[in-house]
């Protein structure tokens, strides 16, 4: 049987396009570094900036950088003309559900330009995902498990190489995010028509990020202790339910539930009714959501409505805090509010 070696999507992008347009990237200088890499590989890289935060991490003085400060309604025609004029063959963005990126995907497809989207890594840590045509629920990846079982024997066996660790974690990401929003709100007149994909109020973010930092510091020691208990198997058999950021596109666009809260309560209800008596459930609150949403009130209300459960608030390492619920007859619910 002839075996196949899969190319990664970054290599596919590199080989399929000479003129590449970058839209908004993740907070930080990732797209600037990507542009440098593409340029070093002989590509002509164009970039659209939509706000002053974009300008800070990708200076408009970079070659082929365009300041788009027209109205949102003018964007489709502007993009169409730009693609035609500069012979753009690939459009690249981070997140395929931002307002401008939704339009960009349609315009790219109409003009025979490929559309590529980066996303937080499907595999973590140390990875970022890149897919053609869309990510998450828009991903072209097959949904059938048997597809992968059928394809695996056809793939050439390769030696696993662990990814190079990336320095940092939460702190550098938070610094980049704070800097981005400071720039965005400090100079709104340059981009008076910009539409952000999340709340666009500086005070809103400052207050809630401050709460997140305080919670992180407050829970630090207890997080380490809980992590050791989990690793030592103190909680026995358990299911784990990771929660998404409350306003993430996965929730707003792709989720079958109207909110993370409704999903959480559904899971707790199902677990309380159907779980084996010797199992626990750990619900992980997203680390970026700690200052924005506190699900502990919902969980306490749930426990009150189900007197067979009682709860004790604890915390968890890695991400936020953890809530542990114990049933007298031995059903345990470990929920994390990271």
Question: Language-model features: where?
Answer:
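N-terminal beta-loop-helix "entrance" segment that forms/cooperates
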Residues: 53-70
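Conserved catalytic-core segment of nucleotide-activated headgroup transferases in glycan assembly
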Residues: 41, 191-299
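Active-site-proximal region of nucleotide-activated glycan assembly enzymes
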Residues: 114-216
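Short N-terminal targeting/anchoring amphipathic segment
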Residues: 18-23, 82-98
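N-terminal subdomain of nucleotide-sugar transferases
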Residues: 1-51
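A donor-sugar binding/catalytic signature common to diverse glycosyltransferases
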Residues: 90-102, 316-338
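A short helix->loop->beta-strand "cap" motif at the edges of active sites that frequently abuts
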Residues: 110-115, 279
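Nucleotide-activated donor-binding/catalytic signature segment of Leloir-type glycosyltransferases, i.e.
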Residues: 296-316
């Amino acid at each position: 049987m002839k075996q196949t070696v899969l190319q990664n999507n970054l290599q596919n992008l590199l080989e399929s396009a000479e003129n590449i347009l970058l839209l908004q990237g993740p907070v930080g200088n990732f797209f600037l570094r990507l542009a440098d890499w593409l340029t070093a590989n002989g590509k002509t890289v164009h970039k659209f900036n939509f706000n002053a935060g974009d300008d800070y991490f990708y200076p408009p003085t970079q070659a082929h950088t365009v300041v788009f400060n027209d109205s949102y309604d003018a964007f489709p025609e502007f993009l169409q003309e730009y693609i035609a004029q500069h012979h753009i063959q690939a459009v690249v963005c981070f997140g395929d559900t931002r307002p401008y990126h939704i339009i960009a995907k349609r315009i790219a497809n109409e003009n025979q330009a490929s559309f590529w989207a980066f996303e937080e890594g499907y595999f973590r840590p140390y990875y970022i995902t890149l897919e053609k045509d869309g990510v998450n629920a828009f991903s072209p990846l097959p949904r059938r498990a048997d597809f992968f079982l059928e394809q695996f024997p056809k793939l050439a066996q390769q030696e696993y190489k662990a990814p190079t660790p990336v320095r940092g974690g939460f702190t550098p990401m938070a610094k980049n995010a704070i800097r981005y929003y400071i720039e965005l709100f400090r100079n709104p007149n340059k981009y008076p028509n910009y539409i952000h994909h999340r709340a666009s109020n500086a005070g809103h973010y400052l207050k809630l990020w401050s709460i997140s930092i305080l919670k992180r510091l407050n829970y630090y020691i207890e997080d380490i202790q809980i992590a050791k208990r989990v690793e030592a198997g103190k909680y026995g058999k358990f299911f784990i339910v990771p929660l998404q950021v409350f306003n993430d596109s996965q929730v707003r666009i792709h989720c079958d539930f109207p909110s993370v809260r409704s999903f959480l309560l559904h899971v707790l209800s199902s677990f309380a009714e159907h779980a084996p008596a010797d199992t626990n459930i750990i619900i992980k609150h997203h680390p970026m959501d700690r200052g924005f949403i506190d699900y502990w009130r919902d969980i306490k209300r749930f426990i009150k409505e189900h007197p067979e459960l009682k709860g004790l608030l604890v915390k968890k390492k890695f991400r936020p805090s953890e809530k542990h619920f114990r049933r007298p007859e031995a059903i345990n619910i470990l929920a994390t509010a990271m």
